From Swiss-Prot:
UniProt gene name: Lrrc26
Biological source species: Rattus norvegicus (Rat)
Residues exposed to the Extracellular side: 31-265
Name of this chain's protein: Leucine-rich repeat-containing protein 26
Span list, region Disordered: 312-334
LRRNT domain mapped to chain residues: 38-75
Gene3D superfamilies hit by this protein: Ribonuclease Inhibitor (3.80.10.10)
Known partners and oligomeric status: Interacts with KCNMA1.
Keywords: Cell membrane, Cytoplasm, Cytoskeleton, Disulfide bond, Ion channel, Ion transport, Leucine-rich repeat, Membrane, Repeat, Signal, Transmembrane, Transmembrane helix, Transport
Length: 334
């Protein structure tokens, strides 16, 4: 019966029906061996102990008083919530087992130390929240592996210095939150390494009205902000003890500031410095040798002249042989 039915159909349609039958049999076999438990479903991620996971790759580990990043993370995890815990340190490769993470929240922990290789392996991470922690410093290259990052929050920490090498080139970063830290200025190359940056949150920092603010003021003029935000961006003048709006400084206000050397210029200085020192030392040694030789030559001339003067006879002649004390006198006396 089945053979007669398939024989009446076109060959293409017969192959399509056979393919559908094979797919249906595979689905029945999967349900029999795996079951309907969502924890065993390939859609649900492998869940760390004490955390709750849901289909779609979300792992919720919030407010569990965890002292460290939980073990048991997998590549199925797309979103990891670790906020409101007691994680104080991020070691190297802390999230290496969750390389498919897109969203990572570490807000309101007790973070004081983040290793420079803590985020290695998170090349597709898009959002990272490190706000409301106790970070005072960050190592160079900490965020360099996060090439796909578009949102980064460092708000509510104790950062006093943020060098360009810490962030590294983040070509897709659009939002950077730095509010409520201890920043007084931003390094010149920091904003240049973030070409896609559109939102920069800065309020709540003790900005100092100095030449170091020139890169930041230039960026703010090129990226107008809402009035409510710009009104809170104030800097303190150390000499006058007054508050000024960051947006009130035109570019000519920094004309008295000396332009700092670029990295390329510094490299040239560092390269030529030892060479120029060695060249100066060689010149000094050469001049010293020449002067020493000239002095020795003058001394030899003076010595020769003195010997010649002593050997010349007296033009008046000796008064007697006794005065001269010649060998002849000595022989006669003998």
């Amino acid at each position: 019966m089945r053979g007669s039915f398939f024989s009446r159909l076109p060959p293409q349609l017969s192959l399509l029906l056979l393919l559908l039958l094979l797919l249906s049999w595979r689905r029945v076999w999967t349900q029999e061996h795996i079951g309907t438990d969502p924890s065993k479903s390939p859609v649900a991620p492998v869940c760390p102990e004490a955390c709750s996971c849901s289909p779609g790759g979300k792992a919720n580990c919030s407010a569990l008083a965890l002292p460290a990043v939980p073990a048991g993370l997998s590549w199925q995890v797309r979103s990891l919530l670790l906020d409101r815990n007691r994680v104080s340190t991020l070691p190297p490769g802390a999230f290496a087992d969750a390389g498919a993470l897109l969203y990572l929240v570490l807000r309101e922990n007790r973070l004081r130390s983040v290793h420079a290789r803590a985020f290695w392996g998170l090349g597709v991470l898009q959002r990272l929240d490190l706000s409301s922690n106790q970070l005072e410093t960050l190592s160079p290259g900490t965020f360099t592996p996060l090439r796909a990052l578009s949102f980064l929050s460092l708000a509510g920490n104790r950062l006093a210095l943020l060098e360009p090498s810490i962030l590294g080139p983040l070509p897709l970063l659009r939002v950077l939150s730095l509010q409520d830290n201890s920043l007084s200025a931003l390094e010149a190359g920091l904003l240049n390494s973030l070409p896609a940056l559109d939102v920069l949150r800065l309020h709540g920092n003790p900005w100092a009205c100095s030449c170091a603010l020139r890169p930041l003021c230039t960026w703010l003029r090129k990226h107008p902000r809402p009035t409510s935000e710009t009104e809170t961006l104030l800097c303190v003048s150390p000499k006058l003890q007054t508050l000024n709006l960051l947006t009130d400084f035109p570019d000519n206000a920094f004309k008295q500031c000396t332009q700092s050397l670029a990295a390329r210029d510094l490299a040239v200085v560092y390269a030529l410095g030892p060479a120029s020192f060695l060249a100066s030392l060689a010149i000094c040694l050469a001049l010293g040798s020449v002067l020493t030789a000239c002095g020795a030559r003058r001394r030899r001339r003076r010595t020769t002249v003195r010997h010649l003067i002593r050997r010349q006879p007296d033009p008046e002649g000796p008064a007697s042989l006794e005065d001269v004390g010649s060998p002849t006198t000595t022989a006669i006396q003998a």
